[in-house]
Amino acid sequence: MAMIKAQELVSSNSVVVFSKTFCPYCTSVKQLLNQLGAQFKVIELDSESDGSDLQNALAEWTGQRTVPNVFIGGKHIGGCDKTTGMHQEGKLIPLLTEAGAVKA
């Protein structure tokens, strides 16, 4: 059930950040996306009744257990280092634009 929920969240939102409220890396990714003016959905796993199940499903699906777990345009991006690295390489904004999360 958690896998289906995770997949539905990813497929119905241009950008999804699976996060935890106390995680500084999650905060960094959310701040970056906000600075870029991106529209994104945040799922705080520690605030969801099925957060643990969702995290297990994400680990099974992506091979990544840690948060943040970022998806853009239905594609798994990764965590904080991967997301910020893509931005530093100039690859994040085009991906966000293509996904419809930021205006071109």
UniProtKB/Swiss-Prot annotation:
Family label: Belongs to the glutaredoxin family. CPYC subfamily.
Subcellular location: Cytoplasm
UniProt function note: Has a glutathione-disulfide oxidoreductase activity in the presence of NADPH and glutathione reductase. Reduces low molecular weight disulfides and proteins.
One GO MF term: glutathione disulfide oxidoreductase activity
InterPro entries in the cross-refs: GLR_AS, Glutaredoxin, Glutaredoxin_euk/vir, Glutaredoxin_subgr, Thioredoxin-like_sf
Domain of life of the native organism: Eukaryota
Alphabetized UniProt keyword annotations: Cytoplasm, Disulfide bond, Electron transport, Redox-active center, Transport
Main location as per UniProt: cytoplasm
A cellular component term, taken from the record's GO annotations: cytoplasm
Protein name as it appears in the record: Glutaredoxin
Keyword DNA-binding appears in the UniProt entry: no
Residue ranges annotated for the Glutaredoxin domain, each copy included: 3-103
Organism, scientific name: Vernicia fordii
Gene Ontology process terms (BP): cellular response to oxidative stress
Disulphide linkage map: 23-26
